[in-house]
Amino acid sequence: MQPLKAFLQKLIPALPAVELDELLALWNTERTLVRGELLNLKGQVENYMYFVLEGTFRICYETEEQEIVVGFGYPGTLLQDSPSFLSGKPSKFYIEAIKAAKLIGIHRTDLYAFVEQNHTFATFWRKLIEQAVLAQIEREIDLLTNSPQERYQRLKNRSPHVFQLIPNKHIASYLRMTPETLSRLKKR
């Protein structure tokens, strides 16, 4: 629980200690996954937001032709199928553990009740959603950029730690290139 507490204290320094403790008590769902296990399934409604304590994850979208990595989760990050979590509609994605993992989760109902009751947290939640929208715009720019070199460089500049945590084949899928192309770009 200490990593989650430190994470929340850093993100919401204005949240009083009593309210932080109330919020931490709502993070009461622990999950342990083995490599290859799914955190959520396509078609299910995502009811939990998780904080990754250990392990790494990939968020995937599947078409008839291919599996596309659209995001990652790793220690110290929040993880959920955002469209399903926010809308309450069935997921179009699945989340898979790349490495054995431990998470702690908060149920959507509990989170939104806390947002309604706590002005400081509501302000934080709004800012978090704004940051997520801006990150999505950056991701769209990544996908609109024609050059694999540019896509690689943008990710390297924005999130260099991803290259230490995530296998190349998943990063390549995320960048919409072959693993061989990614390997060549990394050698330059």
Give the location of each predicted region.
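Cyclic nucleotide-binding regulatory module and flanking cytosolic helices
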Residues: 1-30
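Short, Lys/Arg-enriched N-terminal segment that forms or immediately precedes the first helix
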Residues: 7, 132-141
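A cytosolic small-molecule/anion-sensing beta-strand core signal
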Residues: 34, 53-54, 74, 99
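Short phosphate-coordinating micro-motif centered on Lys-Gly-acidic
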Residues: 39-44
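Glycine- and acidic-residue-biased ligand/ion/polar-headgroup-sensing regions
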Residues: 47-58, 75-76
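Cyclic-nucleotide recognition modules
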Residues: 68-127
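Basic, amphipathic alpha-helical hairpins
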Residues: 115-118, 136, 158-163
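Phosphate-/nucleic-acid-contacting segments
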Residues: 146-188
